[in-house]
Amino acid sequence: MNANLLSTANGSPIQSMTERPQLVWGAPTAAERGPVIATLRNPDHRNAVGSHAGGYSVYRALAIAARTLAHDHIADLTDTAPVEQIGPHPQWCDARKIVSLDPWGHLVGEVFREHLKRGYDVRPTIAVTRAHIDMPEIRAAMAARRIRADGDIVSAHGSVRVMKAAIDPVWYLPGIAERFGLDETDLRRGLHEQTGGMYPELVSRPDLKVFLPPIGGATIYCFGDSAKLGDGLTPLACRVHDECNGSDVFGSDICTCRPYLAHGIEIAIQMAQAGGVGLVVYNRKEGRALGEVTKFLVYNARKRQKGGDRPADYFARTECVAGVRDMRFQELMPDVLHWLGITRIHRFASMSDMKCDALLRQGIAIDERVPLPDDMIPPDARVEIEAKLAAGYFAGERPRGDYAGTVGRGLHE
């Protein structure tokens, strides 16, 4: 054996702890893949560009600058292990299947234990816990007898037991470039230049293939037995939802986001209570990843335009302000489902062809698409829904509405 290699407790080789660990993305084991190290305690150990915590990495830098956080703080990972087992799945060992997250990111305390003992500052990029969620829409569904209290998944007063996991982005740059049909050098240059030169290593260190971008990640919510996720046998109901703070949290009625989120949760619960499993994936992509400032500017433009807020101009107003109608890049969205070992969705709560097509391109089958029920659409969101239906969004058996005659509420109403 090479003198620079050590062995873990099970005999798997690991590198000398005086070296920068090599990363072999898609390797068959964690030991062969190696840990992702983007911490700064020892720059010689870094094998990735960027730093941990996604969009919160800048707050960490501010905390260190303000001397409220020690720059050499070492995380105590005692009792932080996942509360439920996820993986490993075959997709973890395919460098083309998962390119935007670290599939071993929730298991660093286990699979990289020897690295931690020898002073490598390896951090989790995924955390898995349990929780109860409580939403008025769930209680309304119980009152309408679409969901029942079972004492297991749903309590008598309407709270729902879930397994949830938070996932920070970890990008394997060659895989990201391939997913978008780009040259890796062009991708690196674009990321470097269009962030104002924020990450010079993107262009100066082509040997570093992994990048931890300062963007939001995703949270998954699993309803029912999470051990059944990815078993290939258990029926799965799924909603992939992109963040909309105004609607999801505050109930703004200009869009259908919260209604569809609630509907996705409802069908996930129904599937779990029928012996299957339910899943909601919540991606931090506010305003179609254009951001909330841009979204509110578009709202103003829609409401102030001559003739009022109309479906015919719904996408055009976004393009006028942002230059593009959507930057969510659903090409990366299937990765979280690959992480969970999912190969088939039996009921998919989505009207978006972009989401559906992205999953199909990645080999994830969809048996049934479930549109948002018409009675869940807020009045002012009719503009959005008519525009999307005209653009080809899936509607199921719903008849077309009054596209030409639909006008949204005025700005000052």
PLM regions: where:
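Catalytic domains of riboflavin
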Residues: 1-413
